[in-house]
Amino acid sequence: MEIDSEKIHERKQSDYNSLDERFEIQKEMYRGQQYSQIYFARLHLMRTLLYSLAPTWKSHLPVCKVLGLEKGKECIIVGTLFKHMKLKPCVLDEYSKERSVTPLVKPHNFMHPDDNLILEDESGRVKLAGSALSPAIYVTGVVVALHGKETNAGEFFVEDVLEAGLPPQIERPIDLQEDKYVVLLSGLCIGSKSANPLQFQLLVDHITGHLGDEEEQGLAAQIVHVVIAGNSFEFPRKLINGQNLASKDQSTLYEPIKELDIMLSQIAAGVSVDIMPGTNDPANFALPQQPLNRCLFPGSSPYNTFRSCTNPHSFDVDNIRFLGTSGQNIDDLGKYSEAKSKLDFVERTLRWRHLAPTAPNTLGCYPFTDRDPFLIETCPHVYFVGNQDKYDNRLIKGSEGQLVRLICIPKFCETGIAVAVNLRNLECHTLSFSTQINQS
């Protein structure tokens, strides 16, 4: 009698190291401080960097402060950009037009042909002119060095621009001989009408090795880590009104959390998983968002493989550095600047060395007093952004040989797509679990 013996696949192991400490708000105390201090900290750190790059960029030119500009004299100035936007919403306008018959227009993008840029340092500010610096590309909060001269009109005519560029990168390990994968997904939106429980369950079954034939299970065994990049929940807005809820409404609110916890406990039983907060999740609104409370996940939190993380989130897997957000930083850039694709926005933040340049101007963030945690000091190998409309990826190379895989993760509830990143070569591909359910 023949006995069929099924091959047992052992999941590959990896070393994990969280780097979220700089995004955690622990010792900070809010004493009514304003946001000027985070801008000052950003300018101080970035100016030191740009000063060090200036001699190799324009060694023959002096570096001046805005207050020290002389008409017609070429020089370099370093400062923070401010973008004057005609269509940018204003709180005062909202109050003044509250009773007006004219509706407040809320366009998807607030760009206007008359927008202009201003450079500011601690000594003063100057309006910028010339075509070398496009208002369509830059936003308020970016620190740059500019080569140019002051005109008779009192403007600074820009002839060239120096950005910080990609930061130094830790060396990729050369001893990775086998394929190992990190799976990235976002926008589960459990509780929404667009959420499909079958899609997520198929993904969970694939990750845990309960789906497919022997070859499929062998591929699943190569998954060593899972990251859920925000917007895991969607609650009924009518119930979130600050009022006491009836027991039935409380149960309705808790249902999406309970459903996600069941799914996460299945994943955590077989592989390590990180969950990041997003715009719609029960976490603080301002960046950096703090980890979702572990009491929300009574089934998952007992596993040491389950981690509730910050947004932004940074970590190493087998010395491959990952950095990512749940998408708020890129979505905000899309409102106040233009690009051919979301990946262009992602690449710009990396070359500006700042995760969220529009914070705190148009993107909420904590008023740090002595540091700016969004500065990118070390170049990641993988830089991902969650909750985008579609999947996209790009491999970029820095001037010092840095290689970075940029990834836009689509909303899983709308696309049924997750992204698998190979640690060995930084190649990535999609895992598609799109299904059709008849609502008739």
Curated annotation (Swiss-Prot):
Main localization, broad class: nucleus
Keywords: DNA replication, DNA-directed DNA polymerase, Nucleotidyltransferase, Nucleus, Transferase
E.C. no: 2.7.7.7
Origin superkingdom: Eukaryota
Catalytic activities: DNA(n) + a 2'-deoxyribonucleoside 5'-triphosphate = DNA(n+1) + diphosphate
GO MF term list: DNA binding; DNA-directed DNA polymerase activity
A single BP term in Gene Ontology: DNA replication
Single GO cellular component term: delta DNA polymerase complex
CDD domains documented for this protein: MPP_PolD2_C (cd07387)
Record protein name field: DNA polymerase delta small subunit
Species of origin: Arabidopsis thaliana (Mouse-ear cress)
